[in-house]
């Protein structure tokens, strides 16, 4: 079955261009031209990925992203912005977008991003043949449990609501427990490209993870900042 992509943009020429190129690459494409229509189609069509413009009528892309995440709809979101402004990019990522691109862009570049995001989601997604009691490869760090084969993570026995990118980052940290990982390394390993050196993307996602597993985000005991270097995930110490 072909993967389904929801393309949301109020510029008809961009929608037509993206739809044509994505369909040529073998995807089923549905479209929306405003934020309200995007929310409705996301809820009813359950796409595998959304290509979402920031500047939209009725509801902008930032609000659409926010509402989708509030409804626990965790499919990947690739945001498009005509503004080369850090505010748009960082805010979108803070609200749960997985990736962004700045206009103008080439259709080939969009196809490459879509393919990479879907491939990572597919690799991380649980197999339909997986039994519930299969826990091979689980990573346990204090009260945190990561189940790579099930694409799930738990903290104090409660399942965490994570976006695909948050899970991939947590999993990479967990697989390298106790190691200091630079922001550049995390960009390369989790995002597969360097975002032109924009390491704030890592910081935003680390902040999201801390919100979900740290009792005090100002004094984290799991995900530690190593000043001037990066981050590491470690076992909490008894006196912390």
From Swiss-Prot:
Residues annotated to bind DNA: 136-235
Subcellular location: Cytoplasm
GO terms of biological process kind: phosphate ion transport; regulation of DNA-templated transcription
Record InterPro entries: CheY-like_superfamily, OmpR/PhoB-type_DNA-bd, Sig_transdc_resp-reg_C-effctor, Sig_transdc_resp-reg_receiver, WalR-like, WH-like_DNA-bd_sf
Residues with 4-aspartylphosphate modification: 53
Keyword Phosphoprotein on entry: yes
GO cellular component: cytosol; protein-DNA complex
Domain of life: Bacteria
Signal peptide: none
Post-translational modification: Phosphorylated by PhoR.
Keywords: Activator, Cytoplasm, DNA-binding, Phosphate transport, Phosphoprotein, Transcription, Transcription regulation, Transport, Two-component regulatory system
Response regulatory domain mapped to chain residues: 4-118
GO MF term list: phosphorelay response regulator activity; transcription cis-regulatory region binding
UniProt cross-references to PANTHER family, sorted A to Z: ALKALINE PHOSPHATASE SYNTHESIS TRANSCRIPTIONAL REGULATORY PROTEIN PHOP, REGULATOR OF RPOS
Role this protein plays: Member of the two-component regulatory system PhoP/PhoR involved in the regulation of alkaline phosphatase genes phoA and phoB and of phosphodiesterase.
Protein name: Alkaline phosphatase synthesis transcriptional regulatory protein PhoP
Source organism of this protein record: Bacillus subtilis (strain 168)
Origin organism lineage: Bacteria, Bacillati, Bacillota, Bacilli, Bacillales
């Amino acid at each position: 079955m072909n993967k389904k992509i929801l393309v949301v943009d109020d510029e008809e020429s961009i929608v037509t261009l993206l739809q044509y190129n994505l369909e040529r690459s073998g995807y089923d494409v549905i479209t929306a031209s405003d934020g309200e229509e995007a929310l409705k189609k996301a809820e009813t069509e359950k796409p595998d990925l959304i290509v979402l413009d920031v500047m939209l009528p009725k509801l902008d892309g930032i609000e659409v992203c926010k509402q989708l995440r509030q409804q626990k709809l965790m499919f990947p979101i690739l945001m498009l912005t005509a503004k080369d402004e850090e505010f748009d990019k960082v805010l979108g990522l803070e609200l749960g977008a997985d990736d962004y691109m700045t206009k103008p862009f080439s259709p080939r570049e969009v196809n490459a991003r879509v393919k990479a995001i879907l491939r990572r989601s597919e690799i991380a997604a649980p197999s339909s043949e997986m039994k519930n009691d299969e826990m091979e490869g689980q990573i346990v760090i204090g009260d945190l449990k990561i189940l790579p084969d099930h694409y799930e993570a738990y903290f104090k026995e409660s399942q965490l609501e994570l976006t695909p990118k948050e899970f991939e980052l947590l999993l990479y940290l967990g697989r390298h427990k106790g190691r200091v990982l630079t922001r550049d390394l995390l960009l390369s390993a989790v995002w597969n490209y360097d975002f032109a050196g924009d390491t704030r993307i890592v910081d935003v996602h680390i902040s999201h993870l801390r919100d979900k597993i740290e009792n005090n985000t100002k004094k984290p005991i799991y995900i530690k900042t190593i000043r001037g270097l990066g981050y590491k995930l470690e076992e909490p110490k008894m006196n912390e």
